[in-house]
């Protein structure tokens, strides 16, 4: 039903007459409504958007066969952006603002850029763990311990770019054999895989699960102020990936799309985006917000972004072969 609804929404977008000064966006980013409102205020360009995870966007792009129903892809896991580039589904655009973005956070050929950094961490429900006599897991090894059987929730990496980034990071850090052995143990604690990256933290908030693997953005960290939950980075190693953005090949509103990329990478745009969903940003000189917990940069896994993207199909095929029965 949800897929049908998404298709209907996109169909409605396609049938609508979009004049100059409009922009159609698929987005997987916290605070997007206010971000787009500020962009519209600054540029006069009206934004129509729909929320969709990165894996869903990639599948839809391929099905549209060069006739995209949107102009810009904003947010989501970088693996899908790299796959889309390799399949010829993205428009090359080197924004002048990219001079202030380190090369490790953007495509050297100009097909995508990072917006912010997504780090992967844990969220625990303190009351649930206390009731069950459990300590909060401190490391990835802890998370796979038998004591957390059926207590861990995480998103399906085939759909959630954040969770695919976690899988790819750990494979790159541990090596294939050790990583897949680890995932076998971890998945014994995971009764099912959620469809979206934002679903696991909410299931911990409501007490359905004691522990979640989450993207460590302000959107979820701020839940600590309202609920008995704690968010934190693993003590052993921190998976990470840039949240991407790109223009679709054959975008109808290309000029508006380019203006959005310029704005989102500008000092003004990066500040607005950071303030609406606090994260570490990609542009040089943009301060990390206080709400984002202190990051031990030495704990970030040393990853190859190209490997993360180019190995996506191989990694997900192996994941689905082993754990596909857990997909929700």
Regions found by a protein language model. Name each.
Residues 79-83, 205, 210-228, 277:
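A ligand-binding cleft/hinge motif common to bilobed small-molecule-binding domains
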Residues 100-103, 182-187, 193-194, 225-249, ...:
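Periplasmic-binding protein-like
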Residues 15-19:
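Sec/Tat signal peptide C-region and signal peptidase I cleavage site
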Residues 29-33, 68-208:
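Extracytoplasmic ligand-binding site segments that recognize negatively charged/polar headgroups
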Residues 20-83:
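Early extracytoplasmic/lumenal segment of secretory-pathway proteins
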Residues 243, 248-303:
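Mature extracytoplasmic/periplasmic domains
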Residues 90-99, 112-113, 141, 211, ...:
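Short beta-strand->loop
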Residues 176-178, 279-328:
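An extracytoplasmic/periplasmic, membrane-proximal ligand-sensing/linker region
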């Amino acid at each position: 039903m949800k897929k049908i609804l998404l298709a209907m929404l996109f169909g409605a977008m396609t049938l609508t007459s979009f004049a100059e000064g409009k922009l159609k966006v698929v987005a997987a980013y916290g605070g997007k409504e206010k971000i787009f409102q500020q962009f519209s205020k600054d540029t006069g360009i009206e934004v129509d958007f729909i929320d969709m995870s990165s894996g869903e966007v990639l599948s839809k792009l391929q099905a549209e066969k060069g006739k995209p129903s949107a102009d810009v892809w904003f947010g989501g896991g970088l693996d899908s952006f790299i796959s889309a580039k390799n399949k010829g589904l993205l428009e090359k655009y080197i924004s002048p603002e990219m001079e202030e973005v380190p090369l490790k956070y953007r495509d050297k050929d100009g097909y995508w850029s990072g917006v912010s950094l997504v780090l992967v961490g844990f969220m625990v429900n303190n009351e649930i763990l206390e009731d069950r006599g459990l300590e909060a897991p401190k490391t990835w090894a802890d998370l796979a311990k038998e004591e957390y059987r059926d207590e861990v929730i995480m998103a399906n990496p085939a759909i959630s770019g954040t969770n695919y980034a976690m899988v790819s990071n750990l494979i790159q850090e541990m090596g294939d054999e050790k990583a897949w052995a680890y995932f076998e143990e971890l998945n014994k604690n995971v009764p099912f895989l959620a469809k979206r990256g934002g679903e696991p933290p909410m299931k911990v908030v409501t007490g359905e699960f004691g522990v979640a693997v989450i993207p460590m953005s302000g959107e979820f960290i701020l839940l600590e102020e309202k609920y008995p939950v704690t968010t934190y980075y693993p003590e052993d190693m921190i998976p990470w990936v840039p949240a991407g953005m790109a223009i679709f090949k054959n975008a109808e509103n290309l000029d508006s799309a380019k203006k959005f990329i310029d704005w989102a990478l500008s000092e003004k745009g990066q500040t607005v985006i950071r303030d609406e969903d606090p994260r570490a940003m990609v542009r040089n000189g943009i301060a990390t917000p206080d709400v984002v917990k202190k990051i031990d940069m030495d704990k970030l896994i040393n990853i190859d972004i190209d490997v993360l993207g180019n190995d996506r199909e191989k990694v997900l095929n192996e994941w689905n072969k082993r754990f596909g029965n857990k997909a929700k």
